[in-house]
């Protein structure tokens, strides 16, 4: 039987790693959009630097 990879499981499982990668890609795209729309890096936009 094939393992369901979209189920949310805690720990180092293949499903959890898939979700981690998907959420990391969304965060990276959000950082790129913030930088391109504001002309500042994410840390400058948030006032950290």
Curated annotation (Swiss-Prot):
It is found in: Plastid, Cyanelle. GO terms for cellular component: cyanelle. It comes from Cyanophora paradoxa. Possible role in chlorophyll and/or carotenoid binding. Its main location: plastid. Keywords: Chlorophyll, Chromophore, Cyanelle, Plastid. Belongs to the ELIP/psbS family. GO terms for molecular function: chlorophyll binding. This is Uncharacterized protein Ycf17.
């Amino acid at each position: 039987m094939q393992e369901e990879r979209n189920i949310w499981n805690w720990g180092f499982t293949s499903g959890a790693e898939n979700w981690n990668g998907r959420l990391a890609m969304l965060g990276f795209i959000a950082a790129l959009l913030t930088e391109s729309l504001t002309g500042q890096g994410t840390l400058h936009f948030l006032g950290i630097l």
